[in-house]
Amino acid sequence: MRQFVPRKGKCMREVYDFLKKCGTYYLATVEDDQPRVRPFGTVEIFEDKLYIQTGKAKPVSKQMVANPKVEICAFDGNTWLRLSGEMVPDERVEAKKHMLDAYPSLRGMYNENDSNTQVLYITNAAAVFSSFTAPARTVTF
């Protein structure tokens, strides 16, 4: 019997919906040989890619430029998600505007036309959904 493999867009949407439901997720990067983890809340789908947002002046931005491999972790009270992949900066105004339109409260600190706003999308993504009551399930996009 052939196993059903979801389309990449459906897998990305499932990850997006889970992150939105959680509200806050934790982004792990590496600085030299030291892991760094901090809370994040921005996540959007734009042009069939999963994006996050930060500021170029922040250490997290510099860490992702030096080593684009990241892991995101989120927990909804029952299930947790570990999403790994590589972040790719997108300097286009359209991508920045889409993110800031989705999070208007950030407009006090960021603007799609400034030199600080940074949006990045994830590639080579693998998301593992886990819980104490069900086997782990992996999706990729």
Q: What is each of the regions a protein language model found here?
A:
Residues 2-4, 82-141:
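Charged, gly/pro-rich active-site loop segments
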Residues 2, 26-27, 41-50:
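Short, basic, glycine/proline-bearing loop/turn elements
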Residues 17-31, 70-72:
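A short, Trp-centered hydrophobic/proline-enriched beta-strand micro-motif
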Residues 43-78:
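A short mixed-secondary-structure module that forms the rim of ligand-binding clefts
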Residues 1-11:
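Short, Lys/Arg-enriched N-terminal segments with co-localized hydrophobic residues
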